[in-house]
């Protein structure tokens, strides 16, 4: 059995998957914030419960936001302060008496989709998350590409390209990102960015679902906004796809529920790619909230 943990600032979710990659059991508990020992206890207790329920000693994979293992072997995860700065992988491996694998949660999302029965035919899979922020991951031949700093796929921290400014206007405001840089594309393409763009152009403060509802009702202003957003997304993805050239692009996160993104993006991409380039197949993520657990569990399938 393969145990996959999706750990975030509010919850620890465990999913248990069998050899056919089917979910057999899952459980969620709140993420402890009081101490590192309480955090370790929460993870270990879930593993013990799974072992007992299923009568096996399953392998353990963990997806967590941030850098799973820095040069000194410690975790960097600002959203999980109880464990950040601690040697999480080594400590859990010792307590659980088994190999524990860690990776960035966005890489786990991409790995989950790459191992979907429909998608295993594609050698290079790019996962793109359009949620609170913008992130993603790359999977080559069933294995995540992490890079030495675990930042492969941090697409949201690429800067706006020149073509984006041509589209939006050279007086378009470059917003400061939480990473400290100016003009990171997640400030414009995330769910928050989608809403910010609407407020910038129309001086109305609406959340993304409200804007999408107006678009579905045929509102002209919402229609113009969505057209602009899709063009901006295509411009930015054109740069990324020219570098990565994936066979498949899978889009997840809250905005992936907006069908116009997956249905209309393909027709806008070619003008931003090299003439000889082929646009990837574009699909919405298949596994929703279970994707993080699936991908973490499948870290043990990548040998």
Swiss-Prot record:
Binding-site residues, ATP: 4-11, 133-140
InterPro entries in the cross-refs: ATPase_NBD, N-acetyl-D-glucosamine_kinase, ROK, ROK_cs
Name of this protein: N-acetyl-D-glucosamine kinase
NCBIfam families per record: PRK13310.1
Statement: the UniProt record of this protein carries the keyword Acyltransferase: no
Function (record text): Catalyzes the phosphorylation of N-acetyl-D-glucosamine (GlcNAc) derived from cell-wall degradation, yielding GlcNAc-6-P.
EC number: 2.7.1.59
PROSITE patterns reported in the protein's UniProt record: ROK
Recorded name of the encoding gene: nagK
Top-level taxon of origin: Bacteria
Recorded metabolic or biological pathway in which this protein acts: Cell wall biogenesis; peptidoglycan recycling
GO biological process: N-acetylglucosamine metabolic process; peptidoglycan turnover
Entry keyword set: ATP-binding, Carbohydrate metabolism, Kinase, Metal-binding, Nucleotide-binding, Transferase, Zinc
Alphabetized Pfam families for the sequence: ROK
GO MF annotations in UniProt: ATP binding; N-acetylglucosamine kinase activity; zinc ion binding
Family membership noted in the UniProt record: Belongs to the ROK (NagC/XylR) family. NagK subfamily.
UniProt binding sites for Zn(2+): 157, 177, 179, 184
Catalysed reactions, as listed in the record: N-acetyl-D-glucosamine + ATP = N-acetyl-D-glucosamine 6-phosphate + ADP + H(+)
